[in-house]
Amino acid sequence: MRHDGPMHVQPGVGLQSDTSSSTGTGSGPADEPEAEKSAWGYLPPTAFRSRHSALSSIQQQTWERRWPQLGRQATAHSQPSARGHEPIDPIDARAWFGREAPVVLEIGCGSGTSTLAMAQAEPNVDVIAVEVYRRGLAQLLCAIDRADLQRINIRLIRGNGIDVLRDLIAPESLTGVRVFFPDPWPKARHHKRRLIQPSTVVLIADRLLPGGVFHAATDHPGYAEHIIAAGDAEPALARVDPGVDSLPVSVVRPTTKYEMKAHNAGSSINELIWKKQR
């Protein structure tokens, strides 16, 4: 999701319980991107700094009740895995959800409007929603409560999406990856901070099962071109037309308030979908 302010989460993550207060970040010391680059050999595409964000009393109560069951906190490792793209501590989705089902990872779920709607539409699919903002995750937990789902097929991770994808997701374990309206970082000098880079797409393709779907959406024409170039350059992926091609998970999204604002401002929405070749 597009974010309003800068934040930073170090690359390399594991899972632990979240012990942060309602105004805490739970992300540990925030290093400057250039220092991070010298340690890791690259500048993470999402070098943000986590901002403080107080929860309402209802959100705090829901967080305390629901998070231990549905949520995980991603924590920083000091060094990347020596195995390259191999995950450090892969999630056992079957154990976490309590069943065997297709798994979709949504990076940057925001307040979870699309997450919940798409999960409700496909109760046979399990969704892992990743977000750095605690308040957004708390809003999603409250929405899950209000929806009164017969079976909750959503789990939440608080952390940097690329790090979660790299360190917590096993190769060929996902049926889908969703990235809706990531920050376009429109200034040329900030393009290196864009979430979707060629290296990101390589990682996504590695984590997808054969036949799995990478679904991105943006209202920024320059970013759309950037995403298309990165997706089309990955030999394991082929762009598809959802109206023609058979897909294992839905690519029908709800229209969010942000999307309506973009539409009213005259922006076109670019739906970009690739399928991993068998």
Curated annotation (Swiss-Prot):
Pathway: tRNA modification; N(7)-methylguanine-tRNA biosynthesis
Keyword Transport annotated: no
Full protein name: tRNA (guanine-N(7)-)-methyltransferase
Entry keyword set: Methyltransferase, S-adenosyl-L-methionine, Transferase, tRNA processing
GO molecular function term, any single one: tRNA (guanine(46)-N7)-methyltransferase activity
HAMAP family (UniProt xref): tRNA_methyltr_TrmB (MF_01057)
Native source species: Mycobacterium ulcerans (strain Agy99)
Region Disordered, residue ranges: 1-42
SUPFAM superfamilies, sorted: S-adenosyl-L-methionine-dependent methyltransferases
Lineage: Bacteria, Bacillati, Actinomycetota, Actinomycetes, Mycobacteriales
EC numbers, comma separated: 2.1.1.33
S-S pairs: none
Gene: trmB
Family as reported in the entry's similarity comment: Belongs to the class I-like SAM-binding methyltransferase superfamily. TrmB family.
Domain of life: Bacteria
CDD domains assigned to the protein according to its UniProt record, in alphabetical order: AdoMet_MTases
Residues annotated for substrate binding in this entry: 187, 219, 256-259
Reactions performed catalytically: guanosine(46) in tRNA + S-adenosyl-L-methionine = N(7)-methylguanosine(46) in tRNA + S-adenosyl-L-homocysteine
